[in-house]
Amino acid sequence: MAPSMIPFTIKLKTCLKMCIQRLRYAQEKQQAIAKQSRRQVAQLLLTNKEQKAHYRVETLIHDDIHIELLEILELYCELLLARVQVINDISTEEQLVKEHMDDGINEAIRSLIYAILFVDEVKELSQLKDLMAWKINVEFVNGVIADHIDVPEKIIKKCSPSVPKEELVDLYLKEIAKTYDVPYSKLENSLSSSSSNISSDFSDPSGDIEDNDEEKPILALDNDDNDNADAKHPITVKKPRQNSENIKNELKIPKDIKKEVIEKKQSEKKTTKRKTKKEQENDELDELKKRFDALRRK
């Protein structure tokens, strides 16, 4: 089959699947580099090269922002892949804006086209741009790249890196120092200040306490009692609530049931007595029979 005869939906599906694979691979590669960079920063902190570690952390922050961008672009590709048939029905930019502002298709297409210049490791995005230029028009693609038309602000920020704030760099350095157990001057200062605050909290006793609760007795109350503790018994301990395991043996049995139980026991005793009498009579008869048999033999 000639390339020109391949349907647009098949081209778009193939391109999006390739973009997803490349974006995932780029994320994994970038994460491995970031992990190695953190170890290098920890080594610099260990050798007291904090200024050099500071600059390395700035690069590390830019790498993390780039990884976030790759993750967002992957989600956009997944969204478009799930809605290829819907995209196939789009023919103009006006239709794209009018019908697909709320379902995410307009945002995803513009973001992927705009990010082409900032994601060099995914060449398949340029193929996606060409497909969109063929489907809608070239002016649409050029307007997105040059004028940022309807491109989300979060994508523009992640594609235009700036110098990170000092607080963010310090936070990264502190976390790396904690993770790899290496010294960092600002981390030690923060730990010493927090420990001094804790010690001051414990060293300042409140002057309002006059009585010593340790000398006062402890009062044990029933669990169902609503009595509150008084001044003599500031500490109260509730007894365990009665349940099937700790219930007392002193149960009140109704009179009717009690009568039936007593009568039943008495009848059982009588039957046992009757049985014993009958057994005795049978034993005596057996003995007499044995004696008569013995006399006959003689």
From Swiss-Prot:
One Pfam family name is: Ist1
Q: What keywords does the record list, in alphabetical order? A: Cytoplasm, Endosome, Protein transport, Transport
Biased amino acid composition, Basic and acidic residues? 247-270
Q: Where is the composition biased (Low complexity)?
A: 190-206
What do we know about how this protein assembles, alone or with others?
A: Interacts with DID2. Interacts with VPS4 (via MIT domain); the interaction prevents VPS4 oligomerization, competes with the binding of VTA1 to VSP4 and diminishes the ATPase activity of VSP4.
What is the organism field in this record? Saccharomyces cerevisiae (strain ATCC 204508 / S288c) (Baker's yeast)
One GO cellular component term, please give it: cytoplasm
Q: What is this protein called?
A: Vacuolar protein sorting-associated protein IST1
Q: Name one GO molecular function term.
A: ATPase inhibitor activity
Extra information: Present with 4760 molecules/cell in log phase SD medium.
Keyword presence, Protein transport: yes
Q: From the UniProt entry, list the residue stretches annotated as the region Disordered.
A: 190-283
- Describe its function: Involved in a late step in sorting of cargo proteins of the multivesicular body (MVB) for incorporation into intralumenal vesicles. The lumenal sequestrated membrane proteins are targeted into the vacuole after fusion of the endosome with the vacuole. Regulates the recruitment of VPS4 to the ESCRT-III complex, probably in conjunction with DID2, and VPS4 catalyzes the disassembly of the ESCRT-III complex.
Question: Where is this gene product found?
Answer: Cytoplasm; Endosome
Entries under Gene3D superfamilies matching the protein: Vacuolar protein sorting-associated protein Ist1
Q: Which gene encodes it?
A: IST1
Spell out the family assignment given in the record's similarity comment.
Belongs to the IST1 family.
Q: Where is this motif: MIT-interacting motif?
A: 286-296
Cited InterPro entries: Ist1, IST1-like
